[in-house]
Amino acid sequence: MRDQRNQDQDVGTPEHRQATLPAEITDAAAGAEAVVFVCATCSVPLTGPLTRLPEVPEAPYYAWWDADEPGPSPATVPSGCYAVETEPYGGPLVVAQAPGPVMPRHGGHWNVEGKPLVSQGPRGNIVINPDDARGLELQHASPACCGATPDGGMNQLCACGTLVATLCSDCCLPYELHLSAEHVRAVRP
């Protein structure tokens, strides 16, 4: 499964796997100061230098049902960038009063009784391109056909054993890694 690849290596991600952003957003990111995200427990770097985007981009369109090979959708956030998620993301999922997206850039989700669900996960996650992560290990991910879903909450371990992030990598979902704002910190490179 793609999630279990060595994230320390440059895997040569094809261009179609990258998000394409409007020039005004990429220009703003180019002028921003880069930071490295480290584990709050052990201070090990979890990313290389990343520059902040003004907001999380919309997930690129991807016809996953027509893909030649199963795997993740194109990344929501371009390589070398990050953005802060302002809405709840990941588990736990709770019954909602009305149907709607279960979390940002996701469609509806229902429990076995047909009731709509919504994320009650944390706000303020740092959203990055999963290919920009270093040294993380997949832990107890909610499985789907081609990868991990964020439904069960954090699923990425630092080398020290601390859960630090939530990977979303199934073919029909946005390809994103959400670093937990409570478990990582930004430092200057």
Question: Model features per residue range: what roles?
Answer:
Residues M1-P189:
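N-terminal pre-domain and mature-chain start segments
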